[in-house]
UniProtKB/Swiss-Prot annotation:
InterPro entries: Glutathione_peroxidase, Thioredoxin-like_sf. The keyword Cytoplasm applies. GO terms for cellular component: cytoplasm. Keywords: Cytoplasm, Oxidoreductase, Peroxidase, Stress response. GO terms for molecular function: phospholipid-hydroperoxide glutathione peroxidase activity. One of its GO terms (biological process) is response to oxidative stress. Its EC number is 1.11.1.12. It comes from Encephalitozoon cuniculi (strain GB-M1) (Microsporidian parasite). This is Probable phospholipid hydroperoxide glutathione peroxidase.
Length: 177
């Protein structure tokens, strides 16, 4: 998919927020975005949530936004109500997370956000466009293009070159800060 088309397709997507409101990804135009499918009972939860909170502490003012999409498809590891999930991650890790309603990330019912992400050039993983587990992460630049896909056990660090390049690129022109 051509970058301009990828960008417009991304910003044209929306998802239901934890409170039931429809949230347009276009509202994050100009921000660097990390999108992850999450599950609180997953063995990767603690390390990823701590990493995300640290990234927000360092880069929130520079336009980083982390969008969490709870998913119960993998061994039922996110079976709690969405209000509980949001409450826990907000209290224990960061109140800056953007938490969405539960979604499916694979199969016929896969949410359009994840269908889009896995079908971009940089959104494919080792298994092609299949998301193999919780905490698969997608880094999206300020133009709405997927820069990198991280696996469930990959902990995104503050010095990750793709993250730093995305943060630095266009920082002065960012919106939604």
């Amino acid at each position: 998919m051509e970058r301009g088309m990828e960008s417009e397709a991304f910003y044209g997507l929306s998802a239901r927020g934890w409170d039931g409101s429809e949230v347009s990804l276009g509202s994050f135009r100009g921000c660097v975005i990390m999108i992850a499918n999450v599950a609180s009972s997953c063995k990767f939860a603690e390390s990823n949530y701590k990493s995300f909170a640290g990234l927000l502490d360092k880069f929130y003012r520079k336009g980083l936004r982390i969008l969490l999409f709870p998913c119960n498809q993998y061994l039922g590891q996110e079976s709690r109500p969405i209000e509980e999930i949001r409450g826990e991650v907000s209290k224990k890790y960061s109140d800056r997370f953007v938490v969405f309603d539960k979604v499916d990330v694979f199969g016929k019912g896969a949410h359009p956000v994840f269908r889009h992400l896995v079908n971009t050039k940089n959104g494919k993983g080792r298994l092609g466009n299949f998301i193999k587990w919780n905490f698969t992460k997608f880094l999206v630049d300020r133009k709405g293009c997927v820069v990198k896909r991280f696996g469930p056990s990959d902990i995104v660090k503050e010095d990750d070159e793709n993250l730093l390049r995305s943060i630095e690129d266009g920082e002065n022109g960012m919106q939604n800060s």
